[in-house]
C-alpha cells in the first residue's frame, strides 16, 4: 500500500508554515487518538500516519528532503518511524496540557535551553503598587521606591554550592529536572522528586544562601512617572524583578499606579470637572468667580446674568496632559446656585419685598412654563370628567 502525501495527510498546502502545521496536527491527533477511539484500528492507523507526516514536515531538513525526493528520501526507515520519538512525546505532552490540564506537576515552563530544568531559569516578575496625587499625575515625577528582592548570591555566584565545590547532576533525572512515565500513548512528565526540578544535587550548600543561589536584599530604584498617567496604568521596568537562577535572566518589575481622590477635581480621561457654588445675586445679575486650575494657578470665569444651576463652562486646555502627546484636555466648571441660609430680619424683608413686587413671566421662564403645563394638565382632566 503506497503512502499518502504528507501534506494531504495533514490537510495543508505545501506552503504551510510552522503554526499552520502545528494547528492541523493538533486537530487531527486529537480526532484520531486511540484513547478517544478505543478498538478502532483505522483510527489508530490514521493517528500514526498523522504523527509520521508531522514529524517530517515540522523538521526543516526532513521537509526539504521530502519536498525534493518524496517518500524515497526516507527509504531507510522513515522519519522516526511510526512510533513515538522523544520529540513527539514532548508534543503530545503539550497537547495533553492544552486539552486536559497540566499533567506535569510543578509546571515545567516553556521548553528550550536544551530542555533541562536544571539550566538557566528566569527570575520571577514583581509588582509594586504606587499611589500618587492628581497634581503629580499632571506634572509627572520621579519616585524613589524601596523593595525587597531576591538577588544572586555573591558568595556562590548563584550556584548554591559552597566555595570550592559545585553541584552534581541529579542521577534520577540525568539533569533533566523531570522524569517521564509512559501511560498508553501519552508520555507524561513530572517534576523529579529527587532534585525538585533543579536537575542537580547540592551536597555542600552555600552558607550565605542555604543552597538557594539567591538572597533577599532591599533595593532602591528610581521610577519615572510621565505626565498624564491615569489610574490603573502599569509601568514595566525590564530586568528589575527577581534574579534568575543558575545564570538565568532577571524578571521584570511592574509598577501599578493609582491616583488619590482629589477634593476638588474629578477626572474623565484628559478632562477635569469641578462644581462651584455661586450666589443668587451673581446668578441673576452676572458676576465673576475665581476657579483653581490643576497647575496651581487660578483663573476667572465670567458668569452671565440669568445663569441657572448646572450651567457648565468650558476652559479649553486647562485639563490633564495626554500621555506621550502634546494634547491637553479641558476643564469643565459646573455652577450651582446656593440658596442663602440663616438670613437676618432685614434680608428677609428685602426678599419678601422683592417677591411682592411681582414677577413677570419672562423673569422666570422655566417656572412660568412649568406651571402653565400643570394648569393645562388639570384643565384637561376636568374637561374629560365633564364629558
From Swiss-Prot:
Chaperone recorded as keyword: yes
Sorted UniProt keywords: Chaperone, Cytoplasm, DNA replication, Metal-binding, Repeat, Stress response, Zinc, Zinc-finger
CDD domains reported in the protein's UniProt record: DnaJ (cd06257), DnaJ_C (cd10747), DnaJ_zf (cd10719)
Cofactor(s) essential for the protein: Zn(2+)
Any GO BP annotation: DNA replication
GO CC, alphabetical: cytoplasm
Function per UniProt: Participates actively in the response to hyperosmotic and heat shock by preventing the aggregation of stress-denatured proteins and by disaggregating proteins, also in an autonomous, DnaK-independent fashion. Unfolded proteins bind initially to DnaJ; upon interaction with the DnaJ-bound protein, DnaK hydrolyzes its bound ATP, resulting in the formation of a stable complex. GrpE releases ADP from DnaK; ATP binding to DnaK triggers the release of the substrate protein, thus completing the reaction cycle.
Family membership: Belongs to the DnaJ family.
Protein name: Chaperone protein DnaJ
Organism field: Methylobacterium sp. (strain 4-46)
Amino acid at each position: 500500500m503506497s503512502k499518502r502525501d504528507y501534506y494531504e495527510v495533514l490537510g495543508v498546502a505545501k506552503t504551510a508554515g510552522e503554526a499552520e502545521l502545528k494547528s492541523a496536527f493538533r486537530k487531527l491527533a486529537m480526532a484520531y487518538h486511540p484513547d478517544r477511539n478505543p478498538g478502532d484500528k483505522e483510527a489508530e492507523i490514521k493517528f500514526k500516519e498523522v504523527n509520521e507526516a508531522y514529524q517530517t514536515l515540522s523538521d526543516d531538513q526532513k521537509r526539504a528532503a521530502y519536498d525534493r525526493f518524496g517518500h524515497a528520501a526516507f527509504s531507510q526507515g522513515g522519519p522516526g518511524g511510526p512510533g513515538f520519538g522523544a520529540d513527539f512525546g514532548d508534543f503530545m505532552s503539550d497537547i495533553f496540557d492544552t486539552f486536559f490540564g497540566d499533567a506535569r506537576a510543578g509546571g515545567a515552563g516553556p521548553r528550550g535551553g536544551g530542555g533541562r530544568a536544571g539550566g538557566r531559569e528566569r527570575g520571577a516578575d514583581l509588582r509594586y503598587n504606587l499611589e500618587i496625587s492628581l497634581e503629580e499625575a499632571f506634572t509627572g515625577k520621579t519616585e524613589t521606591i524601596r523593595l525587597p528582592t531576591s538577588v544572586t548570591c555573591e558568595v556562590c555566584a548563584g550556584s548554591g554550592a559552597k566555595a570550592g565545590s559545585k553541584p552534581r547532576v541529579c542521577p534520577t533525572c540525568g539533569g533533566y529536572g523531570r522524569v517521564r512515565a509512559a501511560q498508553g500513548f501519552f508520555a507524561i512528565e513530572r517534576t523529579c522528586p529527587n532534585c525538585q526540578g533543579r536537575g542537580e544535587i547540592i551536597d555542600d550548600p552555600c552558607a550565605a544562601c542555604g543552597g538557594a543561589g539567591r538572597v533577599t536584599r532591599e533595593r532602591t530604584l528610581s521610577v519615572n512617572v510621565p505626565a498624564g498617567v491615569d489610574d490603573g496604568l502599569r509601568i514595566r521596568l525590564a530586568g528589575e524583578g527577581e534574579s534568575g537562577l543558575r545564570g538565568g535572566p532577571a524578571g521584570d518589575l511592574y509598577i501599578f499606579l493609582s491616583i488619590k481622590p482629589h477634593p476638588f477635581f474629578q477626572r474623565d480621561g484628559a478632562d477635569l470637572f469641578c462644581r462651584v457654588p455661586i450666589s443668587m445675586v451673581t446668578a441673576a445679575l452676572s458676576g465673576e468667580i475665581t476657579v483653581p486650575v490643576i497647575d496651581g494657578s487660578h483663573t476667572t470665569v465670567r458668569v452671565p446674568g440669568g445663569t441657572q444651576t448646572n450651567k457648565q463652562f468650558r476652559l479649553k486646555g486647562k485639563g490633564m496632559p495626554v500621555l506621550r502627546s502634546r494634547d491637553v484636555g479641558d476643564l469643565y466648571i459646573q455652577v450651582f446656585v446656593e440658596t442663602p441660609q440663616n438670613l437676618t430680619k432685614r434680608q428677609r424683608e428685602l426678599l419678601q419685598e422683592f417677591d411682592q413686587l411681582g414677577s413677570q413671566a419672562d423673569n422666570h421662564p422655566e417656572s412660568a412654563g412649568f406651571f402653565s403645563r400643570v394648569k393645562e394638565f388639570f384643565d384637561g382632566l376636568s374637561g374629560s370628567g365633564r364629558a
